[in-house]
Amino acid sequence: MLNMPSKLHVIGTPVSSDKIVTSSSTHPELNIQPQEMPILMTFANSPYLFMGKFTVEKNVTLYFAPKSELNQNKINWKPLTTASDEIQNIIAYGNDLYLLSSKGNPHFNILKTNLQKPDLKNAEIVFKGTSEWKVSKIFLAKDFIIINKSKNELIIKQSFYNLKTGKVSSPEIKLE
């Protein structure tokens, strides 16, 4: 489907009362193409709202705004990433943003930047994929990022990044 808007639906209300949050007509400055789907993302522990322009391309263009702007007539989206940043996933925690990126590392890095002054060029690398273990997915679980690493896309291991301490642990799970 082309030219899809992103809407806010309140459970228990009719779909006809859904509010259009972002679309090519409400936000022409975002240059949302007909084939791009504007998808909203929120994280419980972050005061920010994110909007990604998604297509079949893995790398996503992202924008962000304070969650409080959801109550306004129009959200003032600020640019965050472009497809050339090679970002495939994000996790927000407080004012920090963690990004899964293949830029500069075909085995992926997890980057960290502060959303009060985001700076991807100088983002901290908190976890590096290696030629043996590629970072394949990241998930948020309370105060941790679960990092799925794959070896030849056949063997999967997990590491855990503690969002409070910044420490990575990789427990060995023995299968008998």
What are these regions (language model features)?
Residues 1-176:
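Peripheral, non-catalytic segments that deliver or gate enzyme domains
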